[in-house]
């Protein structure tokens, strides 16, 4: 399986061919991304174009002899927006062709002449992983090989339908996302298309993998912080909506009599499908630009993943914000799709942080909210609607490890909650999770090696809540004003605390 049916693989999966599409305006194509073959015609060509249905992403692929193998059309708004942002981005300058030269014009003319003959790929279902056990290929000591097949996303060797790597250590031009795809390709726990494994049959056209592999894959793509990775993440998690599965031990027959009766029962891992996890792309926020302007130098540097921005020294002398600025701080905040980028968004684009220094937060507010900053930096947490450590978090707030919530409760007992944010710590709920070693499993049964999480009642938070209710004398706090939050763009607890104090 090429790990990811993305950008190009999505086209094959949906089965949309140029032959069945309205006429394309060939004189209005743009953002051409070509993959040449030395001394031969083009291998692949991707570009944006308009037809009667609107803007779409087109892809064509030729074999080594110049014969057209597949051409496809995809008009998903997320993909076309991502491709356009990638085309205009600084990191891909020189990769895209904006003014076609003679060779590219000939390729477009050839593609136009072959329009009616264009058909989808007549190969195995997208996402099929071919395995060969050791000894089958005559090479001892090799348990699995990834065979060159299909076609891949331009600039990568492992992302797409198949792979084009000469060996397992070779990577493409976009090495970061290519590495993510390669590692996800090697997930040891998966169910191939139309195959039966772990007690379930996969009726999809793509392979489904263990949730831990998908979680690592998503985190790897998000860590790259570039549009190439975002295109792949959006296609895999949002467009194709590929689910994942967790393994649970169940009692089943492990040895049968010849006449069909069960001779011996044992513990066998069974797969349980989990809902898909959405991918939050950095380019989805209009305030985030791939080509930062000189006036915003803070956006031109990669931001640290966990540590918030350092406050400039001159802010320490600023006074408390006025009533006008305090109102502005409670306005909706346009935040990127991840918590680690929300601090940058607040500093650069939020109106409450612009203008004179009198509207900025006093240093006391940051000290009072530092407990929530530690909570955001919790090493083990499960995001909303996310499956991690074989546990699905169905809530709309993150689920934290008990060590992190216990540290928060200890801080609040000693120092009290920040003024104006007395109930913020109750948003994650009164539960947390602990990690346990994987279930005992006989060697060779394909059991997951990652720890598994289980939810428990956070008694330290319950005691804190009871104490607050006793001091308050009422069961609710109607005076608490929550910060506005755009749906799908979560704000970190630290930034919520800053808005409330």
From Swiss-Prot:
Residues 1-19 form the signal peptide. One of its GO terms (cellular component) is extracellular region. It catalyses: a 1,2-diacyl-sn-glycero-3-phosphocholine + H2O = a 1-acyl-sn-glycero-3-phosphocholine + a fatty acid + H(+); 1-hexadecanoyl-2-(9Z,12Z-octadecadienoyl)-sn-glycero-3-phosphocholine + H2O = (9Z,12Z)-octadecadienoate + 1-hexadecanoyl-sn-glycero-3-phosphocholine + H(+); 1-hexadecanoyl-2-(5Z,8Z,11Z,14Z-eicosatetraenoyl)-sn-glycero-3-phosphocholine + H2O = 1-hexadecanoyl-sn-glycero-3-phosphocholine + (5Z,8Z,11Z,14Z)-eicosatetraenoate + H(+); 1-hexadecanoyl-2-(9Z,12Z-octadecadienoyl)-sn-glycero-3-phosphoethanolamine + H2O = 1-hexadecanoyl-sn-glycero-3-phosphoethanolamine + (9Z,12Z)-octadecadienoate + H(+). CDD domains: PLA2_bee_venom_like. PROSITE patterns: PA2_HIS (PS00118). The gene is PLA2G3. The keyword Transit peptide does not apply. This is Group 3 secretory phospholipase A2. The active site is at 184, 214. The keyword Secreted applies. Its cofactor is Ca(2+). Keywords: Calcium, Cell membrane, Cilium biogenesis/degradation, Cytoplasm, Cytoskeleton, Disulfide bond, Endosome, Glycoprotein, Hydrolase, Lipid metabolism, Mast cell degranulation, Membrane, Metal-binding, Phospholipid metabolism, Secreted, Signal. Residues 119-139, 284-339 are annotated as: Disordered. One of its GO terms (biological process) is cilium assembly. Secretory calcium-dependent phospholipase A2 that primarily targets extracellular phospholipids. Hydrolyzes the ester bond of the fatty acyl group attached at sn-2 position of phospholipids without apparent head group selectivity. Contributes to phospholipid remodeling of low-density lipoprotein (LDL) and high-density lipoprotein (HDL) particles. Hydrolyzes LDL phospholipids releasing unsaturated fatty acids that regulate macrophage differentiation toward foam cells. May act in an autocrine and paracrine manner. Pfam families: Phospholip_A2_2. Ca(2+) binds at residues 158, 160, 162, 185. PANTHER family: RH14732P. Residues 150-291 are annotated as: Phospholipase A2-like. Belongs to the phospholipase A2 family. Disulfide bonds join 159-181, 180-220, 187-213, 211-244. Residues 284-298 have a biased composition (Polar residues).
């Amino acid at each position: 399986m090429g790990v990811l049916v993305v950008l190009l693989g999505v086209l094959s999966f949906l089965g949309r061919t140029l032959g069945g599409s309205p006429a394309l305006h060939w004189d209005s194509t743009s953002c051409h991304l070509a993959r040449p073959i030395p001394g031969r015609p083009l291998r692949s060509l991707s570009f944006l174009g308009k037809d009667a249905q609107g803007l779409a992403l087109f892809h064509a692929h030729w074999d080594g002899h110049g014969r057209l193998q597949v051409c496809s059309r995809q008009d998903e708004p997320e993909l076309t927006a991502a491709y356009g942002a990638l085309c205009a981005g600084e990191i891909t300058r020189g990769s895209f062709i904006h003014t076609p030269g003679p060779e590219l014009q000939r390729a477009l003319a050839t593609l136009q002449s072959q329009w009616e003959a264009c058909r989808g790929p007549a190969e195995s279902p997208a996402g099929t992983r071919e395995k060969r056990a050791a000894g089958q290929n005559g090479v001892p000591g090799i348990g699995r090989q990834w065979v060159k097949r299909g076609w891949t996303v331009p600039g990568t060797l492992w992302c797409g339908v198949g792979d084009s790597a000469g060996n397992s250590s070779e990577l493409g031009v976009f090495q970061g996302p290519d590495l993510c795809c390669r590692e996800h390709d090697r997930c040891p726990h998966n169910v191939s298309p139309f195959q039966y494994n772990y007690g379930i049959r996969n009726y999809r056209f793509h392979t489904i993998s263990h949730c831990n592999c998908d979680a690592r894959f998503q985190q790897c793509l998000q860590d790259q912080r570039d549009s190439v990775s975002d295109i792949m993440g959006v296609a895999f998690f949002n467009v194709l909506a590929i689910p994942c599965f967790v393994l649970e031990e169940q009692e089943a027959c492990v040895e049968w009599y010849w006449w069909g009766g069960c001779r011996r029962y044992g513990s066998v891992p069974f797969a349980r499908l989990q809902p898909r996890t959405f991918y939050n792309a950095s380019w989805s926020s209009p305030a985030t630009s791939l080509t930062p302007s000189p006036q915003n130098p803070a956006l031109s540097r990669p931001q640290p993943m966990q540590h918030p921005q350092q406050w400039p020294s001159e802010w320490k002398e600023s006074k408390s914000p006025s009533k006008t600025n305090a109102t502005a701080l409670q306005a909706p905040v346009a935040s990127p799709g991840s918590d680690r980028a929300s601090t940058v968004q607040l500093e650069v684009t939020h109106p409450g942080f612009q203008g004179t220094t009198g509207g900025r937060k006093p240093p006391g507010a940051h000290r009072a909210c530092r407990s929530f900053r530690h909570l955001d930096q919790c090493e083990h947490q499960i995001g909303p609607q996310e499956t991690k450590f074989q546990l699905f978090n169905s809530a709309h707030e993150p689920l934290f490890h008990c060590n992190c919530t216990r540290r928060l409760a200890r801080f609040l007992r000693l120092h009290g909650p920040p003024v104006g944010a007395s109930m913020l710590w109750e948003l994650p709920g009164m539960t947390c999770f602990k990690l346990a070693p994987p279930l005992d499993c006989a060697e060779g049964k394909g059991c997951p090696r990652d720890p598994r999480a289980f939810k428990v009642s956070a008694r330290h938070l319950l005691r804190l809540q009871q104490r607050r209710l006793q001091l308050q004398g009422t069961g609710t706090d109607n005076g608490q004003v929550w910060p506005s939050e755009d749906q799908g763009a979560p704000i970190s607890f630290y930034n919520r605390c800053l808005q409330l104090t």
